[in-house]
């Protein structure tokens, strides 16, 4: 006794055309048993293709009940319908519907990917099926390299891949010559003898007569249902596709790899369009990374300038602030303030400063130079490095010695032929001084680093050069791990107690550092926000192109759904493509930014862009996130398509 496999009861299908409803199928009642070979025949517009689409779960009836192997179809969601197509149906289309970027072997494997078969098992079965159909020498040919008959054989092999047992053939010979058409019909008869249920949809009664049973449709109604010949002896059930079970993780991995490969193929097929789409991401990422690197570089440069003044230092000046017109008349900042400051527990070192500009002579060389009177701790406070000789000690300050320390600029100017300056006597104004040491040039200090600097004990400058008893400034270096603001307040209290009034002001280099860090961070953030606009524009471009890609590949979407792709599979495929476009754009953008940094370093010797791993990682994450956000809507649009509408899309 035959087993009912496909059962339709009262099936009606209506379509809305503008304001008018068109009924394509009218109260169809059919039962197709397991192992039957049935032909559904009718003229164009009879509803035969619509009936096949409902049979294959590619379309849903407007009314009535449809069961597949006793399972009601009407209440199933899209993923359950996809599962039904994977497990029970194989489709043979008139126009083959092969994926052009895949080989014959790859096309046949597609249903097994969505069925969760292992890679080795599906590759072996696909090769076996193609070999049985006479394509053993065409396994790695693409559809464009195959004849129509060969493409249809690949389509048949794909239909058999999951061994669902039900073959739905829509005009399988319609696009073939007579010889190829007869070969396809012969294959279908062989499949029937092997126990497969074969349903052929055709308008040609000659083709229909090859079936055991012919169902005629006219204007959406069954007008005839007859046996053409007695039932042949067939296998009780079709050959099963045996394959080892795979874990859910491996199934997901295989589907992901397939989606990844298809994304790469799609990008490669439209290389120029892909590049132009990436361009917005490339420019955006390069802009953001470069701006951050530029901001970091400028911040480090400015902080280096501050450090050149001495780390953790407080500068004490007479007056109420820079630009105070009365500052020159204030003479209360004196050498006697140094000792009390030095004795404070939070103070590391103290150096006074008094300076003047004079003409400096050595032999027949005369130059203008800045003469600074400083204490013995000046070089420690400022962080200068001794290149040669010695620094003057405390005794030089006490004894008003005429010892001098010069910088490398002064050495190069006064001793251009490489003479050793140590022990040489130079004339500073009218005061002869003996050079005892050379310190390295101050890198990154405020002002020009080409100045000629000479340092002598401040007592010598005050008594023997400028004839004044007050100081221009005092620099205090605070010990490490001491809060600068607290130290500033303590020094303020101490000097106010000594002077009786606040006739001085203090420049806190730590406050300047914090202010500059905050300012550069704000500016970097501001410019980065501007650069992010280009990323946003690039993301919109990605979304636009992905929408175009979805439209162009609508038929591919339909084919994948027909062979069992889930909604998540379709969405994943297009989402991966969008993410890859943005990720590759991000990589190219970072590379472009690094190239800009190299070029910038060649053009600027004393300033460099500083890249951080965090900004580069953030760039990759940002580009991937853009791919996900702007790729989501096109991917969702693709995943929401109805299989039949996608297949019919030109």
UniProtKB/Swiss-Prot annotation:
Residues 6-244 form the ABC transporter domain. It is found in: Cell inner membrane. It is an enzyme of class 7 (translocase). Its EC number is 7.6.2.-. Residues 227-246 are annotated as: Disordered. InterPro entries: AAA+_ATPase, ABC3_permease_C, ABC_transporter-like_ATP-bd, ABC_transporter-like_CS, MacB-like_ATP-bd, MacB_PCD, Macrolide_Exporter_MacB, P-loop_NTPase. It is a multi-pass membrane protein. ATP binds at residues 42-49. CDD domains: ABC_MJ0796_LolCDE_FtsE (cd03255). One of its GO terms (molecular function) is transmembrane transporter activity. SUPFAM superfamilies: P-loop containing nucleoside triphosphate hydrolases. The chain crosses the membrane at residues 275-295, 523-543, 580-600, 615-635. One of its GO terms (biological process) is response to antibiotic. Residues 233-246 have a biased composition (Low complexity). One of its GO terms (cellular component) is plasma membrane. Keywords: Antibiotic resistance, ATP-binding, Cell inner membrane, Cell membrane, Membrane, Nucleotide-binding, Translocase, Transmembrane, Transmembrane helix, Transport. The keyword Cytoplasm does not apply. It holds the Pfam family ABC_tran. Part of the tripartite efflux system MacAB-TolC. MacB is a non-canonical ABC transporter that contains transmembrane domains (TMD), which form a pore in the inner membrane, and an ATP-binding domain (NBD), which is responsible for energy generation. Confers resistance against macrolides. Homodimer. Part of the tripartite efflux system MacAB-TolC, which is composed of an inner membrane transporter, MacB, a periplasmic membrane fusion protein, MacA, and an outer membrane component, TolC. The complex forms a large protein conduit and can translocate molecules across both the inner and outer membranes. Interacts with MacA. Belongs to the ABC transporter superfamily. Macrolide exporter (TC 3.A.1.122) family. PANTHER family: MACROLIDE EXPORT ATP-BINDING_PERMEASE PROTEIN MACB, MEMBRANE COMPONENT OF TRANSPORTER-RELATED. This is Macrolide export ATP-binding/permease protein MacB. It comes from Pectobacterium atrosepticum (strain SCRI 1043 / ATCC BAA-672) (Erwinia carotovora subsp. atroseptica).
